[in-house]
UniProtKB/Swiss-Prot annotation:
Higher taxonomy: Bacteria, Bacillati, Bacillota, Bacilli, Bacillales
Organism: Bacillus cereus (strain ATCC 10987 / NRS 248)
Assembly behavior: Heteromultimer composed of HisG and HisZ subunits.
Keywords, comma-separated and alphabetical: Amino-acid biosynthesis, Cytoplasm, Histidine biosynthesis
Name assigned to this protein: ATP phosphoribosyltransferase regulatory subunit
Subcellular localization(s) per the UniProt record: Cytoplasm
GO CC annotation: cytoplasm
Amino acid sequence: MTKWKRANPNGTRDYLFEECTLIEEVEQKLRRTFLERGYEEIRTPTIEFYDVFAFQSRPIDEEKMYKFFDEKGRIIVLRPDMTIPLARVIGTQRCDTPLKVTYSGNVFRANESLTGKYNEIVQSGIEIIGIDNVRAEIECVISVIQSLQKLKVQSFTIEIGQVQLYKCIVKKLSIHEEEEKVLRTYIESKNYAALSNFIREKNFDRCDETVRLLEKLPRLFGNLEVIEEAEKLASSNEMKMAIARVKEIYEAIDKLGYGSYISIDLGMIQHLDYYTGVIFKGYIYEIGEEIVSGGRYDELIGNFGEMLPAVGLAVQVNQIVKALQEQQEPYERKRIDIMIHYELNRLAEAERLRNLLQKDGKKVEISLCSNLNDTFQFARKNQIVTVVEAKNESLVEYVWNEKWVVQKEGETSCVTFKLR
């Protein structure tokens, strides 16, 4: 029964010291950026009823949820997503809208073994509820670009897609559900040959504008030239409106000077039943992993109450940390400047001295060793060159110079000792 007591469950790991500090720093910098832009915080439980995620257009497969039972036999899950619980809160609490919210927390998904994906990850994100115009998408993109800039993430791009355009094409060509699922994989993977074969097998007229748009869809990625190409082939007002929305977002972001951080990919299709319009994906070139995902989901909150338009995105904190570790100089823990050793009856004076020295910008620690020699050994092992001893009615400062030598001594007050 103790076979696995020294191991971690599949897809999980321990985070130690510098890496743990970096994760916390990334979360806090994201939080500060979002709060500065007017987002308000929401926290939801780590566990939720399975029913919260059990709706037809859910983006997470049931097999990827960690499930167990509560004391009444009801199915509980570790949350596999942050947006859906947030939608539950908005739908059931009848919050006043429009509303801008931010969150951060761990999510859990049971990925297949050997995929290289972790089953527990940290997400920080934003959601804008109650706004159906393009300003909501623009705000999301600006917020995430500024947050990544403040984190000093290098070489990232935010791709902007539009699932509504693809839905219009599928509807106009009367492609059935099962065929559509196959078609979607061809477009997402940019499998041009398979897409061409699909069109041929369906006997679609290759001169038809909608068919031509479908065939070009995987190739429609880049800058505004992509929009111009798509506009020429858009055969309905709905298609034109979907394309125009992406164009508006791109142009607005570009005018702010953020054009180098964004691109368009009209062949990007994710969670088709979940998202209803513009979608986002962010990448860092060096790691090739998704660091941002999101989009417009106008039908989600209606599963829990009143139908409300919404758009949001999540930042994958673990991937950001991975990128920062590769892009920046190795993180060095700040070395301790001074170690204070004290006799038990001098603890108060040792603490006062520590506080005074820290105000001067020094990194100071109180020794946990029971005698001065052990403190000296600890200091040498950790490259600490100054030790202060608080004993009897005096303070003594030692410095390492081939051996421990007394630098100053005899002061009874930590204030005058520091000033000497």
